[in-house]
Amino acid sequence: MLDCYVVKEVSNDKLKWEYEFVIDKKYFLDQLDSKLSEIAKNVKVPGFRVGKASIDLVKKEYLNDVMTDVVRKTIESTSSDFVKSNKFGEIISSNIDIVSYPNYYSDNDSKEENLVYKLSFEVMPEAPLMDIDSIVLNGIEVDIQESDVSEFIENLKKQRPNFIVVNGAEYAVQEGDKVVIDYQNKVKGKILRGGSAKDFALVIGKGVALKEFENQLLGMRVGETKSFPLTFPDDYSVAYLAGKTTDMSVVVKSIYVVKDVQDNESVARSYGFKDVAEMENFVRKQIGQQFDQMVLTIMKKELFDYMDNTYSIDVPECVVKQEITKINKEILDSGEDIQIDVEKEAVRRVKLGMLLIRMSRHNNITIKNEDVLSFIKNNYTDYGVDINNVLKMLQSNKNFANYISGKVLEDKVINYIIKLVKKDRKVMTTKEINLMFENI
């Protein structure tokens, strides 16, 4: 530890500390004079050759700048020396408040004539290591019943409805029907670019076209022609149409209605399966994968509750504040009326994060490139996001990269723990698991 300063503890509040430093005046002035002498050897002062100006002239010109630089370096060296010597651990926030500056021209060695500053900081404590052997979670196994398979197949039918053509001119278009039309869209009698089509098919209510356009088709019959004004919204994706009113003309050429397919054999063939048995095996596998993810989420919640209730940790105030800001943004972005104790949730998240980090360090759990790519695939590209855009974000946005790394490491540690803990085997139906999942 350096002997050029004296330290006094001002406050100590769990993880937050404050100290007052008084720097030895002779030490400081020696540093200042050394720097001024170094400058004097190389500086060019008007009227003098390089290095020939008197030290008094150099002081007059450079004292303030040199003083600022020496103060900065002295604070850095003494505070760093003190923190390292006392092994405070990981400092996550700090602040310097200069109380007084030394008077270069005074011989007074009182405290007020010295460099005095206060250093306040907050440390990240080491969380306790969790005892994995004491953790018991519910090892839920899903019981897939015939009714689950039947319900899944019914949803397959709805996703690929069986349309049959309507014969005759009496039937009027309804919501859910498929219509085949010819249309022309004009402004001042001129057809717009891309504003006409023949044999254009759309299902009413699917949102393929503007709602106002679809509403005009409701009630029309085969062979009927209709003209009407159509106003495009101000934020319409095609810029030259945004906010404009056009003249639309439509002819209904054919109408198709949904006819439920009763036999599963037809459904199986429509999806490319060779028979019903192959389709049902596929369905069981899909249901199993879906509920495996739900069970994993339920087990994570159980694990987090156990960690939160079992371990008491002092959490850093500055990290909690950052988490509060993050949670408030999540609530705002969701657009939902979420009623939670934000500060309590922030403290919980920080505590859980500290416990997981300790576990990762103790067991040398690290993340690899393939872990990151797998996470991106499961959470972004499987939902239509271009993987190249995500990778560019990783390289250009440090906050996003830190977020992804944190989530990947968290998942890896959680999966490591869940794999090792004791489990009480429990067989549950899909309805029971759904209920548990909804109550998380």
Swiss-Prot record:
Q: What is its EC number?
A: 5.2.1.8
Keyword Lipoprotein assigned to the entry: answer is: no
UniProtKB keywords: Cell cycle, Cell division, Chaperone, Cytoplasm, Isomerase, Rotamase
A GO MF term: peptidyl-prolyl cis-trans isomerase activity
Q: Which residues form a coiled coil?
A: none
Q: According to its UniProt record, where is this protein mainly located? A: cytoplasm
One GO cellular component assignment for this chain's record is: cytoplasm
Domain free text: Consists of 3 domains; the N-terminus binds the ribosome, the middle domain has PPIase activity, while the C-terminus has intrinsic chaperone activity on its own.
Cite the NCBIfam families for this sequence. tig (TIGR00115)
**UniProt-recorded name of the protein:** Trigger factor
Natural source organism: Ehrlichia canis (strain Jake)
Q: Which gene is this protein's source?
A: tig
